[in-house]
Amino acid sequence: MPESKYRQQTIRAPRGTVLTAKSWLTEAPLRMLMNNLDPDVAENPHELVVYGGIGRAARNWECYDAIVDALTRLEADETLLIQSGKPVGVFKTHDNAPRVLIANSNLVPHWATWEHFNELDAKGLAMYGQMTAGSWIYIGSQGIVQGTYETFVEAGRQHYNGTLAGRWVLTAGLGGMGGAQPLAATLAGACSLTIECQQSRIDFRLRTRYVDEQAATLDDALARITRYTREGKAVSVALCANAADILPELVNRGVRPDLVTDQTSAHDPLHGYLPSGWRWEEYQKNAQSDPHGTMQAAKRSMAAHVRAMLAFSKMGVPTFDYGNNIRQMAKEMGVENAFDFPGFVPAYIRPLFCRGIGPFRWVALSGDPQDIYKTDAKVKEIVAEDKHLHHWLDMARERIHFQGLPARICWVGLEWRQKLGLAFNEMVRCGEVSAPIVIGRDHLDSGSVASPNRETEAMRDGSDAVSDWPLLNALLNTASGATWVSLHHGGGVGMGFSQHAGMVIVCDGTDEAAARIRRVLHNDPATGVMRHADAGYDLAVECSVEQGLNLPMVAATQGKG
């Protein structure tokens, strides 16, 4: 069978209440798969690429067609199995089992390298699923905006007396993930200068209001930043250039930003990071003709990029890795002190993870933005005392452009996820919203990932690389009745550096859905509290006691068992 990764076809999820599949439990994954490939959502939908270098929704177009057909036919007591973007089986299970189980990009550890993966990919035997690309719950750049916003806000608290007014962030990358940075900085009160080597990505971010302005030159960009910071305005500026050139130049000029980070697709040197002096078309061509040489050229440029970040850090500028593994790539090219600046999780986010707080997201399958606005109001009603969360929801409504099906994200923890899910399900039952809602999350969450250079960097007990935790998370979500569950490898930081799990559950207004929601939206964040309590974090232990978790070894350690 010929296999095609390119098709000139526009995919959009159906809207409204007319079903293509046999129930909302199978209509939901069908619509979310299609939504991942909506041209307003995906970076390169004609090649099935959703975000993050080559993060795909399906292995090839033949597989996509087969997945759509299988979901359309799937019965209420059947489960579809997806192996690296390919539908490989439909099995009889039961009504409360997941309707889809997904495994993407998983390799035996010794073979978990980009070189081996690329060989398999070329043979049509594997697919890189990133995190939410291959698990069909990507919602565009909004999916990471609040996490980036929370990171910048916490950096402001730690370094600048609680405010980023009059400050500016230097970063790079305006792809599916990096595109969130300028808007997050603006919402946090800071100016930003984001370097991006592809004009098309800048154009997209300007069109969707994630970036305010584009500068013509570096001098122009710096003049704008100087003017806006002096005036106390939070304005985002993009510059079309290569970060491997611009950051060293800024160091040479003695320019001093207030925060430095990066969200280029450095995790994938073959497809995601343009070598200095190359054009993008040249990069794509060389990736096919000379993959090893291309990867080495990209990593040499990353080394220059990281040396500049280290120089900023040495100046006293708060500098952090935003989870793209650029430090690792630089270290492999001889930058021995690449890890002298921290990752964003140990620096700013881990206390949230200890309480099971992470990226809770939901999507209106109706396609009606009013359904999201009604759920926004419901969140404010239930989480009544959290004014920081209310402020986020207000800013999100004002500034965030929906991509594809309307969606929202807000970071909430173990205490609230189940309550919100049950409330959404009741809204569907009562007709307050016009169609069912799906609830999911990023794989970047407190209990669903092992990634020693990102989410689990510098764990208190040294368990950074232990990947039992995401496996247990996936197993528990399956046992709890999530609508679909995914287990991936390599997301965010690339092959060999992470394992992670995802889940999505449908709120269709039924009593059966409510029972599943009670289990899934408690157990899923509870695994994060469990994981951090097991690692010895007092905040997580306290949360486990408050929420009544049964953690035998933690209880024994605390003298309670």
From Swiss-Prot:
EC main group: lyase
Subcellular location: Cytoplasm
Domain of life: Bacteria
Cofactor: NAD(+)
GO biological processes: L-histidine catabolic process to glutamate and formamide; L-histidine catabolic process to glutamate and formate
Keywords: Cytoplasm, Histidine metabolism, Lyase, NAD
Cofactor note: Binds 1 NAD(+) per subunit.
GO CC term, one of those recorded: cytoplasm
EC number: 4.2.1.49
Active site location: 410
Cross-referenced Gene3D superfamilies: Urocanase like domains (3.40.50.10730), Urocanase superfamily (3.40.1770.10)
Pfam families, per the entry: Urocanase (PF01175), Urocanase_C (PF17392), Urocanase_N (PF17391)
Pathway: Amino-acid degradation; L-histidine degradation into L-glutamate; N-formimidoyl-L-glutamate from L-histidine: step 2/3
Reaction equation(s) it catalyzes: 4-imidazolone-5-propanoate = trans-urocanate + H2O
Binding locations of NAD(+): 52-53, 130, 176-178, 196, 201, 242-243, 263-267, 273-274, 322, 492
InterPro entries assigned to the protein according to its UniProt record, in alphabetical order: Urocanase, Urocanase-like, Urocanase_C, Urocanase_central_sf, Urocanase_CS, Urocanase_N, Urocanase_Rossmann-like, Urocanase_sf
Major subcellular site: cytoplasm
Gene Ontology terms for molecular function: urocanate hydratase activity
PROSITE patterns, per database record: UROCANASE
NCBIfam families linked: hutU (TIGR01228), PRK05414.1 (NF003820)
The protein's role, per its UniProt record: Catalyzes the conversion of urocanate to 4-imidazolone-5-propionate.
Family membership noted in the UniProt record: Belongs to the urocanase family.
Protein name: Urocanate hydratase
